[in-house]
Amino acid sequence: MENNSNQLAANQIIEHDRLTFGDQFAPKGWYWHAFGSKFAGPRILRLPVLVRMPIFILRNLRFYRLPRRIPFTFDADGMATMAIPSFLKTSKFVSAYFRMRVASRAVVDPGLQWRVHQAIWCASNSMKIEGDFVECGTGKGLMMSAVLDSLPDWNNSSKRMLLFDTFSPFGIDSTTGKNSEEHGTRGTYATNIEDVAQNFSEWQKVELIKGFLPETLTQGNIEKIAFLHVDLNHAPAEVSVVRALWSRIQSGGIMLLDDYAQVQQQNDAMNELAQELSFEILTTASGQGIVIKP
């Protein structure tokens, strides 16, 4: 870390994790499992009638169910799975995720491992495509901090990272799409642009552009896009941004929609836009949408 504030945040996170018991990447969840499940299906019909009847009654009344553990390998950010998340143990991911937490300035793990993994995957594949990286809705810079940390050759590449945001701590008004003090502050939103710039100071060719979208898109001199990350928390603004930038995303380029399957309004709006622009959206279990430009 190049600055003291980043080092302080890193030390606080390390100490917090040291005091936390258990494996944060493999929480366990509860589910309901019937004692009588071994009699499920036609096998139960092999039992005598006087044995079957109490089982049927208890099953209908659900008296025979007790909680059992299910070995989730990941349970956070709106999803739970028993799949093998081998990426969690790779040095590339561990370093990138830690860097994201440093950018957040919060010692408590936000549980965004799967979301960060998806962003890293998108960015890694987009490095092979001609064009810049663009993020609309940067906040404190959590996701792109992880992305850049995962790309050791970034400073040697010809790509730029263009980060658009109002860099305001206040929530978004659903009617106007503007930041409003009435909606209070948001923990992942930036307090000011200076702090965000300091966070990205270790990387070259990172440009922060302040203002409301889509109006500020003209300031970036964007010609070709390899990777577009959209996280504006406001459906009309996201639609306007994607419509304005879609033609500049190169074939094979990737668009990542952060709130696609988490907010109904944004889901509906993007589905309509997908039909209009003829692209397909892959819905991920953690609620994001991934589009690969044909």
Give each language-model segment a name:
Residues 4-6, 38, 279:
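Compositionally biased regions
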Residues 16-44, 48, 61, 67-131, ...:
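Class I SAM-dependent methyltransferase Rossmann-like catalytic core
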Residues 32, 87, 92-110, 127-294:
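S-adenosylmethionine/decaboxylated-SAM
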Residues 51-61:
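Alpha-helical hydrophobic membrane-insertion segments
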Residues 1-13:
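Soluble, non-transmembrane catalytic domains of enzymes that act on hydrophobic metabolites at membranes
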Residues 10-11, 41, 46-48, 246, ...:
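Low-complexity, intrinsically disordered short peptide segments enriched in small/polar/basic residues
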